[in-house]
Design a protein with these regions (language model features):
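PLP-dependent aminotransferase-like
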Residues: 39-40
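Terminal amphipathic alpha-helical/low-complexity segments used for targeting or macromolecular assembly
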Residues: 107-119
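Regulatory activation segment
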Residues: 43-51
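Left-handed beta-helix
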Residues: 3-4, 9-18, 23-24, 28-30, ...
Length: 119
């Protein structure tokens, strides 16, 4: 299921798995993968949610990969470029790579220690 006002820019290499759910006003850039985890040998696939859920107003930047049917990206979150994510994140989170580790910060944490954005 894909919600309204879904925006894909530079769609080359984007992969949206069969059971992915994408909310309203989601923006996604090139090379993004919404993919499944490997399942145990012989596990039935029919009727199983294997791909992530992306809630409303999420932005996913280039070459990010979000894995797994239990993974939920909370509304209003931003997933940075080149992030490999196998866990859910709360609404209004910012997810970036930090020294080859995924770093998730909530909106509340960022208001305590604001990030100086220069774009």
């Amino acid at each position: 299921r894909i919600g309204g006002y879904f925006f894909v820019d530079h769609c080359t290499g984007a992969v949206i798995g069969e059971t992915a759910v994408i909310g309203n006003r989601v923006k996604m850039y090139q090379g993004v993968g919404l993919v499944a985890r490997s399942l145990a040998a012989g596990q039935a696939l029919r009727g199983q949610k294997r791909h992530p859920t992306i809630e409303d107003r999420v932005t996913i930047y280039a070459n990010a990969t979000i894995v797994g049917g239990d993974t939920v990206i909370g509304a209003g979150s931003t997933i940075g470029a080149n992030v490999f994510l196998m866990q859910s994140v709360p609404p209004d989170s910012l997810v970036l790579m930090d020294d080859l580790r995924v770093k998730v910060t909530t909106k509340q944490e960022r208001s305590v220690a604001p990030i100086d954005w220069q774009i």
